[in-house]
Amino acid sequence: RIFQICELSRVLKENGLGGFHGVSLEEWLCVIFHESGYDSQALNYYNGSSSHGLFQINQPYWCDDXDSESTEPSVNACQIPCSKLLDDDILDDIECAKKIVKEPKGITAWEAWQPFCNSDLDQWKC
């Protein structure tokens, strides 16, 4: 499912992501746009790992992909199958993103943040 920006903004806000760990809704909307194009089914492969869903949450560290050919054991820090990050229910994705942003790298764990989302965020307001 591809979300519309203001619909996604409302869902993120209702589930406590706006301002969570100092990250604004606009920053999240910008990051999610650049990571997945607001597509809850986005799946990308890079360097032997895979990234899943709206937030492009990475396997093997954050989720477990039982079908993966990765030789690295899964840490599964979010305690979730990667397939659950590819459905239209994004509440589990949001909870995992909260765990990620609380890590030392914070929002910079998402590579899109630095080049695209750390300055003028007016276009991401709803």
From Swiss-Prot:
Give the matching CDD domains. LYZ_LA (cd16898)
What is the protein's quaternary organization?
Answer: Lactose synthase (LS) is a heterodimer of a catalytic component, beta1,4-galactosyltransferase (beta4Gal-T1) and a regulatory component, alpha-lactalbumin (LA).
Q: Does the keyword Lyase apply?
A: no
Where is this chain's protein located in or outside the cell?
Answer: Secreted
One function term, GO molecular function aspect = metal ion binding
The record places domain C-type lysozyme at 1-126
Q: Which domain of life is it from?
A: Eukaryota
Enumerate the glycosylated residues: N47
* Disulfide bonding pattern of the chain: C6-C126, C30-C117, C63-C82, C78-C96
* GO BP terms, alphabetized: defense response to Gram-negative bacterium; defense response to Gram-positive bacterium; lactose biosynthetic process
Its job? Regulatory subunit of lactose synthase, changes the substrate specificity of galactosyltransferase in the mammary gland making glucose a good acceptor substrate for this enzyme. This enables LS to synthesize lactose, the major carbohydrate component of milk. In other tissues, galactosyltransferase transfers galactose onto the N-acetylglucosamine of the oligosaccharide chains in glycoproteins.
Q: Name the chain's protein.
A: Alpha-lactalbumin
User: PANTHER family, alphabetically?
Assistant: ALPHA-LACTALBUMIN, LYSOZYME C
A Pfam family per the record = Lys
Family per UniProt?
Belongs to the glycosyl hydrolase 22 family.
Q: Where does Ca(2+) bind?
A: K84, D87, D89, D92, D93
* Keyword terms, alphabetized: Calcium, Disulfide bond, Glycoprotein, Lactose biosynthesis, Metal-binding, Milk protein, Secreted
